[in-house]
Amino acid sequence: MRNLIILFLLIPLLSISQEEKPNERIVVDDFIQKYNSQDYEGIFSLFSDQLKEEIPYEEISNSLRSLNANLGQVTSTDFLEFRKPGMIEFTVLPVIRIGLNRNHFSSYKISFNKNELRLDISIDREDKIYNISLDEIVDETLEEKAINNLTDYKNIISEKQKELIFDASKHLPNEGQMSFAFIRNGEVSYYGLKRTSDSISSFENSKNVFEIGSISKVFTSNIFASFILQDKVGIDDNINDYLDYDVKDNALISFKSLANHTSGLPRLPNNLKASYSREKSNVYKKEDLDIYIKDSLEINIKTKGKFVYSNLAVGLMGYVLSKIENVGFDALYNSYIFSKYNMDNTTIDSHKSNELLVKGLSNVGNELENMYLDALAPAGSVISSVEDLAKYGLAQFDNSNNDLELIRRKTFKLNNRVSLGLGWFILKAKKNIWFNHDGNTGGYSSSMFIDVENKNGVIILTNVDTEYTSNLGLKLMKSLY
């Protein structure tokens, strides 16, 4: 259900009350009335200016039409709870949770003709929608029913780490898994768990593969860095010089701006249909991307040069790199990344069958189809294991590896604590510098932290798209010091 409507600017939740805010109810009722009458332009008018800039109207209208076709109209709306944010979390595809402002938000149960969903909504001081998401209603009894059966005979994790892990994993549905790699002083250890009949037990899954979502973007930037060092492209070159057709309006787009999300491009192309990412026979093809670039591409002048997270941007960068090399994505990523670092169970070709693949689940335990991004695969289609990602993490500690050093260089400052390299987010954590990227796809979430100076790291893969993964990664990273 996650792909039916965009989830944007969601902030993690700490404080909960049951007091409904009257102004939010007015906005929600207006949203529902416009949805039922299929007034999608009217819904777009309810959004804040910032949200309008980051999500184009076409993307909203396509998602809402798909929602209406699949679930029908809204029959009732019930207030659930009011929540106050307490922290900032970075995640990515297909959800971006970047708390630029610490807005509160309220949750409602929305009953459609064919299903029920949870609506989370936040409004700004002008009563405009600033944050919004529609998602499955999570089984609130999962947490209380969870049985802690975690063991650690090899002393891989501390009691504190075990407590943190259980606290996050008790939100998993049955058959949910988490796979961990811990890097301490350059040494790797693995831990895993699985929930079965509400019992959360240790489980060996270090070789099992999961969708890693937008951690894929780090690999795409890595290939870009390799091209720079091999003089195939320049870091400030425009992609226009490497295409065999003109970009619409001759808009100039640099590789670097694609890598660090400052290009002014939207999150997704406006000709991407809601059904594309789930159906093998109806993927977003390279021909579709070509048509978009030639006929529909628009640069938002207001956001160009500013950070606006874009899956389209990194997908486009990877597409152009593959055209330069004149090979498909599979050959490109195998040559420059997976073979080079002996990542034997990692692939960007999601069509390949893999007996090690853990099936993705919804928040309530329903199996989900895997993603088929095709033309936008460089933005989030890699499938990998914690064992393979740990190999890539260890490679970061090699001071002679110029490719990896280049993608860690700061290219854009987001705020006093967060900057961007080429692919990595760069986080200031007290006396340490951490390189981070997270990922979310429908049915999976991931988190990767690396401290190059101290040779520490944490990698988490799970087969449920949960908001707890990134926060757990951050807490486990802190626990290493």
What do the PLM-derived regions correspond to, one by one?
Residues 119-120, 130-134, 437, 446-464:
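Short, well-ordered beta-strand elements
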Residues 114-146:
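Short beta-strand edge/turn micro-motifs at domain boundaries
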Residues 153-210, 232-237, 291-294:
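Short, conserved catalytic-motif segment at the N-terminal edge
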Residues 65-120:
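Surface-exposed, charged secondary-structure patches
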Residues 1-23:
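Bacterial Sec-dependent N-terminal signal peptides
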Residues 174-179, 200-257, 299-312, 377-380, ...:
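Short active-site loop at a secondary-structure junction
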Residues 251-442, 446:
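Short, surface-exposed loop or secondary-structure junction motifs
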Residues 15-39, 45, 147-156:
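Short, low-complexity N-terminal intrinsically disordered segments enriched in polar/charged residues
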